[in-house]
Amino acid sequence: MNRLCFFNKVVKVARGDSPPFDLASLPPKEQRDLIGETLFFMVEELEPQFAPKITGMILELDQDKVLHLLVTPKAFKEMVKEAMEVLAHSFLQQMKIARGKRC
């Protein structure tokens, strides 16, 4: 079990019995998977119901930006807040469209 530290907490990442690793030494897909797993647990603490969607939204960003968010609590929380605002706006737009089709 490897551990990554973000926000002064330890996130355990299942990676078999391998020794500690450097993220840059992993293939791109494994990097993305590991970052995604870590992000999911972090987002889940703030917005459990929308963690899968928000995690996906954040993973669409440039990897350097994502890594910055992982180690900057204030920026991370702001990004999750922005993602929730986007989701709320999208939901309202869909509701307006649905109402318009009923008339």
From Swiss-Prot:
InterPro entries noted in UniProt: PABP-dom, PABP_HYD_C
Subunit structure: Interacts with ERD15/CID1, CID7, CID8 and CID12.
Residue ranges occupied by any PABC domain in the UniProt entry: 15-92
Organism: Arabidopsis thaliana
Tissues with expression: Mainly expressed in flower buds and in siliques containing developing seeds.
Keyword Acetylation annotated: no
Alphabetical GO biological process terms: regulation of endosperm development; regulation of translation; seed morphogenesis
Induction per the UniProt record: In vegetative tissues, expression is repressed by MET1. In the endosperm, the maternal MPC allele is activated by DME and the paternal MPC allele is repressed by MET1.
Note: The MPC locus is imprinted. Only the maternal inherited allele is expressed in endosperm.
Keyword hit for Nucleotide-binding: no
Pfam families: MLLE
PROSITE patterns: PABC
Gene: MPC
Functional summary from the UniProt entry: Encodes almost entirely the C-terminal domain of poly(A)-binding proteins (PABPs). Plays a role in normal seed development and growth.
GO molecular function: RNA binding
Keywords for this protein: Translation regulation
Protein name: Maternally expressed PAB C-terminal protein
